Amino acid sequence: MSNNAAYAVTPVKTTSTSSRTTFHFAAGLCSGLTSSILLQPADLLKTRVQQSQKTASLLPTIKTILSSPHPIRGLWRGTLPSALRTGFGSALYFTSLNALRQGLAQTEASMAIAASSSDGKSRTSSSALPKLSNWGNLATGAVARTAAGFVMMPVTVLKVRYESDYYAYRSLYSAGRDIVRTEGVRGLFSGFGATAARDAPYAGLYVLFYEQLKRRLASVASSEQSEQPLKSTSSSSINFVSGGLAAGLATAITNPFDAVKTRLQLMPGKYGNMIRAVRLMIREDGVRSLFGGLGLRITRKALSSALAWTVYEELILRAEAHWAEKDKIDL
């Protein structure tokens, strides 16, 4: 089966094979683990820059880590909680996102049919997801991310505390035990309000920008290929570029929430809640503190989102092509 044939799938999926929950979970887990492990140094540096009450500079932070006895280990400090959070968080996110999009696609059936019929038999889209309206993309992204974020919140708190040099935790177990002992179980959910306020608009905007960019880039690529079905390499390139650009835009808009979230998770006793945290940060460190780590976060988010979504969509497209071929043989 050729690559072109393998990708000749319609944008709207209504068969049972297109919503196999287990595979969406596995594909999300694989994509999340890949991006989190490769990009852990950028995430650690972002946490170190944002933790400072006097916004730290990137270069001195890097020099401090590299001058330590174990610089490589230092750059990948916190990889385990980060991989757990991002891996399983991505698995939950993509699984719930697929379920939400499949359900919402049924209510937008007329739009989906029109889009499908206009595409004909060739696939001129790089997407493995059902086509939705802009509001559909915004809503499903926001809801799926908030739900996954709540489930993974304790791991997120452990990750931030362990990456930070504000605490001297020797292991994840000691970190969790100390948090529960001193702050109670609610300490494991410190900063959830700021996290949800960051993740809901970020994820919604990301999916909106991502789908729009893919549509436009696929249209350009299709015209250059004389309306031939998109090749596998073209689809992957479109998804990667779209993922990076969408993440950069969404990250720049939502970075203040990320900065507030980091302070709340590191020093909940001092900052208390989102409103108090914003006031204290601006009063003590200036408005620039709300954009601490922006460059690092954009870099990491652009790369991680591009990697995660490209890997996820590639796995789903190949799996659905395999299932479709298997169904034909069974018939």
Curated annotation (Swiss-Prot):
Species name: Neosartorya fischeri (strain ATCC 1020 / DSM 3700 / CBS 544.65 / FGSC A1164 / JCM 1740 / NRRL 181 / WB 181) (Aspergillus fischerianus)
Keywords: Membrane, Mitochondrion, Mitochondrion inner membrane, Repeat, Transmembrane, Transmembrane helix, Transport
GO cellular component terms listed in the entry, alphabetical order: mitochondrial inner membrane
Listed SUPFAM superfamilies: Mitochondrial carrier
Catalytic activity: glycine(in) = glycine(out)
GO MF terms, alphabetically ordered: glycine transmembrane transporter activity
Membrane topology of this protein: Multi-pass membrane protein
Protein name from the UniProt record: Mitochondrial glycine transporter
Pfam families to which the protein is assigned, alphabetical: Mito_carr (PF00153)
Spans through the membrane: 25-50, 78-104, 138-163, 191-214, 238-264, 293-311
